Structure formats: structure tokens, C-alpha cells
């Protein structure tokens, strides 16, 4: 088993491991009974799996993704997680955050940002801030 020494990779792997445990509970009793912070883990892991880990070999920008873009995408995903974690700590329901559409936008970023314009990923931080401020 290969492990990543980078803290950002470790945080993502930790979230995915936590999601695996939570999915056992979800299979038995459903996700409605989970506390909001655990619902957040499940939602952010969907973004990680679909928007980051899953690869489309037939898409021109997803066939090969430069390391800089991969790292920036991880930054964006973890920024979304931290901002949403703050909202949940304030008592905001995950349903409001998901309804804002920001999870879908972040999931699609690998297709929306060309590999030769990685700087466009910086705009996702602003979009996350805007979505969070609307929910807050």
C-alpha cells in the first residue's frame, strides 16, 4: 500500500476512510439519521471520488492531468470541506449547503478548467466563499 507523505493527501485519505465507515451505517439505517458533520463527510467524499479520483480517459483534459492541477484541485476540495465544516458547526443543515450547487460546481472543475489554464481554479475559492456566505 502506497502512502502519501503530503498532509493534503493524508487528509483526503482520512476523509475517505471515515466515509467508508459511515457508509456501513448508511446501508443499515439510511443517511437521514446521521449528524450534519457526518453528512458533510459523505458529501465531500462524493466530490473527491467523482470530481477528483474518477478519470475519464476519453476527455481531453482528464486523460492526463498535470500535478499542479491535481494539487490545486485538492486544495479547492479541502477548502470547501473546511468552509462547510464551519457552517455545520454554526448549526446550518447540509441540505442548504448542497442546495447552493457548490458541490456540483467543484465536482465538475476538472472538466471546466483546461489543463493549460490552472489559474482558473483560483476562482473556485471565491465561488465557495460566495456560496457559503449565502447559506450563512
Functional labels for PLM-detected ranges:
Residues 1-136:
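Conserved catalytic/coupling modules of large nucleotide/cofactor-utilizing molecular machines
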